[in-house]
Structures are given as structure tokens and as C-alpha cells.
Swiss-Prot record:
Biased composition annotated in UniProt, kind: Basic and acidic residues: 107-117, 164-173, 185-196
Organism: Saccharomyces cerevisiae (strain ATCC 204508 / S288c)
Modified residues (Phosphothreonine): T118
Modification comment: Phosphorylated by the cyclin-CDKs PCL6-PHO85 and PCL7-PHO85. Phosphorylation of Thr-118 inactivates GLC8.
Domain of life of the source: Eukaryota
Protein name as it appears in the record: Protein GLC8
Biased composition (Acidic residues): 175-184
Molecular function per GO: enzyme activator activity; protein phosphatase inhibitor activity
Alphabetical UniProt keywords: Carbohydrate metabolism, Glycogen metabolism, Phosphoprotein
Organismal lineage: Eukaryota, Fungi, Dikarya, Ascomycota, Saccharomycotina
Additional observations: Present with 3440 molecules/cell in log phase SD medium.
């Protein structure tokens, strides 16, 4: 027989007369079963409260990839159901997760982690207790600041007499260039011009490079002749 979209009333009177009552009854039963299956698939996908989400033996409920669009009546029914529910009823708790958490709490309720307290040191005050002298009975140091007391202790420290006498070198470590001091600005300028001319003398540089290259070639030839048997 036809599917759910088949409308037996659209048949002609002659066709209806040819169909027996058992065939019409079977068609209506199939339509009803298909409607129930579609309702269960939709309720399983949307998880609508108030609908029967039970799964019968041998019946396949929609998977996660199943999606059936809702009609206007289903949406209106769902909105009416949600409007009647209280905020507490709308909340859907994960009972399985709650039960697992309770079991975990019971298993680890006697376990305690003992950790030492983290040492805390506040801001250091230069005039605080960490900078005071241990000997509070010393009246001479009572009026001095802690840094002054520490400097006095260092000054009083003596390393003793040296084993060897070190002669002081009265001569300066470097020699002053008196010539540069005595030169006049004209002489310094003339010297600068000569040095610059020597630096930018291309011919002299080329001749120097040529002599160095010839010298290197001569050394290579001498090395090769000495290595021959």
C-alpha cells in the first residue's frame, strides 16, 4: 500500500469501492505507526519534556545526525509546556555526573594534602628591625643610623702589616704627548692634510697591493720548489 503521504480520500469512488476494508485498515495502521515513530524521533532529538522518549525493542530511535523539522503545532506545544514549567523544572541536571561526583567525594574525603606555609617577608624598611644593631646596650651607636654604624665597623677593621714593602711608583703610567700640545693649529691641520692625502692616494695603494701579491706568489713558488724531491 502507499506511504504516509498517500491520501486514500483522493482516490476515485470506483477505486475506493475496489479496496476492501482490510486494506484501508492496514493503511491507517501504517500511517499511525509512522506518525508515532516521527514523534519519538523528534522528541529524542529535541528532548522535549512531556513527550514519551521510551524506546521499544527492535525500534531505532534517531541518532545524533537525525534532524526532523518541527511543524507549527509542535513548536506551539513546546512553548506552552515551557511556559507552564517553573525555573526549577526547566533546569535539567545530569544525574549521572552528580552520582559520579558523590562517589568521588566519598573516596577521597579522608585524603588531606599537607603543605608547608609559604614564608612571607614584608617590605624591607631601611630603618626597621632588620637594620638595627644587635647590641642594643651600645650607647655610642644609639644615635647613629644603621648604615653609619656599618661603615664605622668597616673602618675599624685592620688587615695587619704587609709582609713585603711595596714601593710607590711616582712616575705616571702614561706619557703625555707634549708635541701635540705644543703644535699650533696650523701644524695640526697640515699633518691632517698629509695623512688624508696618504690615505686616499690610489696609486700608492695599488702599488702596495701589487707588491704584496708578487711577494705572495714568490713565496708560493719557493714552497713548491722545496717540496719537490
Amino acid at each position: 500500500m502507499g506511504g504516509i503521504l498517500k491520501n486514500p480520500l483522493a482516490l476515485s469512488p470506483e477505486q475506493l469501492a475496489q479496496q476492501d476494508p482490510e486494506t484501508l485498515e492496514e493503511f491507517r495502521r501504517q500511517v499511525y505507526e509512522n506518525t508515532q515513530k516521527n514523534a519519538k524521533l523528534t522528541s529524542h532529538k529535541r528532548n522535549i519534556p512531556g513527550l514519551d522518549n521510551t524506546k521499544e525493542e527492535g525500534e531505532i530511535i534517531g541518532t545524533s545526525s537525525t534532524f526532523l523539522p518541527k511543524d507549527t503545532l509542535s513548536l506551539k506545544h513546546e512553548q506552552d509546556m515551557l511556559a507552564k514549567m517553573t525555573p526549577e523544572e526547566r533546569v535539567q541536571w545530569n544525574q549521572r555526573n552528580l552520582a559520579e561526583n558523590e562517589i568521588t567525594k566519598k573516596q577521597f574525603q579522608d585524603i588531606h594534602i599537607d603543605e608547608p606555609k609559604t614564608p612571607y617577608q614584608g617590605a624591607v624598611d631601611p630603618h626597621g628591625e632588620y637594620y638595627r644593631v644587635d647590641d642594643d646596650e651600645d650607647e655610642d651607636n644609639s644615635d647613629k643610623k644603621p648604615c653609619q654604624v656599618a661603615n664605622d665597623d668597616i673602618d675599624d677593621l685592620s688587615l695587619g702589616e704587609p709582609e713585603f714593602e711595596i714601593k710607590e711608583n711616582k712616575q705616571p703610567d702614561f706619557e703625555t704627548n707634549d708635541e701635540n700640545d705644543e703644535d699650533s693649529p696650523e701644524a695640526r691641520h697640515k699633518k691632517f692634510e698629509e695623512m688624508r692625502k696618504k690615505h686616499y692616494d690610489v696609486r700608492a695603494i695599488f702599488n702596495k697591493k701589487s707588491r704584496e701579491a708578487l711577494k705572495d706568489e714568490d713565496e708560493d713558488e719557493d714552497d713548491s720548489t722545496t717540496k719537490e724531491p
